UniProtKB/Swiss-Prot annotation:
Signal peptide: none annotated. PANTHER family: UPF0234 PROTEIN YAJQ. InterPro entries: DUF520, UPF0234-like_C, UPF0234_N, YajQ-like_sf. The keyword Metal-binding does not apply. It comes from Rhodococcus opacus (strain B4). This is Nucleotide-binding protein ROP_16630. Nucleotide-binding protein. It comes from the Bacteria.
Amino acid sequence: MADSSFDVVSKVERQEVDNALHQAGKELSTRFDFRNTGASIEWSGEETITLTADTEERLLAALDVFKEKLIRRDISLKAFDAGEPAQSGKTYKLSGSLVQGITTENAKKITKKIRDEGPKGVKAQIQGDELRVSSKKRDDLQAVISLLKGEDFGIALQFVNYR
């Protein structure tokens, strides 16, 4: 019998983030409490999102609106790393970036967790910015998925290519 396997990845669908960004921008332009505050949200580069507003509290409220839209589109908030608000002239800016890929450090933590607490006979291999988990039994793989879902590694994990 051949080994069954799945991949553990940390990826975000850019189109879904773009949709959430446009929804948040539309809400910022139409909501009464954001009128005349200069609140806006936009892409600045491939992976960076910039929020601007006249006051720090309006900036943080705009960030909450964006996070709400991310949640509605089933995007984990761990995938968005928001920076600190910074004042530049009369406006406040906040830049945040999308977190994608599993770092080597996190991959080692995940493999150690699988080795220590997972079922016997399960192998985990680091392949670039993703992780391949394989076993002879599919039940063991499902046990590993539930083990990893119950643990917080600080990144959004997805389980793909289940074979």
